[in-house]
Amino acid sequence: MASKQLKLVIITGMSGAGKTVAMQSLEDLGYFCVDNLPPSLLPKFWELMKESDKMDKIALVMDLRGREFFDSIEPALDELDNTNFITTKILFLEADDKVLVSRYKETRRHHPLEPNGSVLDGINAERELLSDLKGRSQLVINTSNMAPRELRERINNEFQTEDKDIFNVQLMSFGFKYGIPIDADLVFDVRFLPNPHYIDKMRPLTGLDEDVYEYVMKWPETQTFLDKLVDLLMFTLPFYKREGKTQLVIAIGCTGGQHRSVALTEFVGKAIQQKYETTISHRDMKRRKGR
């Protein structure tokens, strides 16, 4: 592991400029994230991380909440710059004074440098203290005119690896009698389709069995619905991805989650797999006794 090049992103900048959103975005990109690590511990922390065979991307939030430790950040960064197995990138987030004041008023929080005084005084003091760090940052983003979604999109564009599609579609079948999946982003009800449950030889089977699958698929309403559903998903998925989502859960439900929803989930999953990383699961299929 020691010979492997490790990536470190240090997230810093003005309080209220979006560091939490940036950290969450990097976490979604597979980074191991630590908030408010004292800079003096940075070299020791990295020595521990390099021994792990599971962590090669680390993101650390460092700001003036730990002001008593912040003076040590420059020596710590100098030490990292001299370490040949670490690639360090500093992400500095800032915003205009007027925007930062407005954000503090909305949240009714005190500025960490002026807990009992003027928010603007705290902003000015923080901007001065961070000026040197901003000067050595590789990426500076002004979030004054950015919504959180837009910042997530910018972070994704800057840091996602080219060889990995970070957008995953999870297709899940389920039975309405057992409840709608609480983590579903989109839910489709296919109980309007003819039900194989009422055919004796198909009742103990599932939508994974050929007889059931062919029965569900033979109906014109099934084919029309699937054409429209796949077309809808292929149209909307790029926009969900653009919003900064890294995962979209699509749930397809029938009465018991055994026949119709299973067959349609398999079909839709195979269609989506042609363009997106896709996971297919059947939440309630094993509830049937004997399976």
From Swiss-Prot:
Domain of life where this protein originates: Bacteria
Keyword tags? ATP-binding, GTP-binding, Nucleotide-binding
GO molecular function ontology, one term from the record: ATP binding
Question: Which residues of this UniProt protein bind GTP?
Answer: D63, L64, R65, G66
Q: Name one Pfam family in it.
A: RapZ-like_N
Q: Specify which residues bind ATP according to the UniProt entry for this protein.
A: G13, M14, S15, G16, A17, G18, K19, T20
Q: What InterPro entries does this protein map onto?
A: P-loop_NTPase, RapZ-like, RapZ-like_N, RapZ_C
Q: Which family does it belong to?
A: Belongs to the RapZ-like family.
- What task does this protein carry out? Displays ATPase and GTPase activities.
> This protein is called what?
Nucleotide-binding protein Lm4b_02443
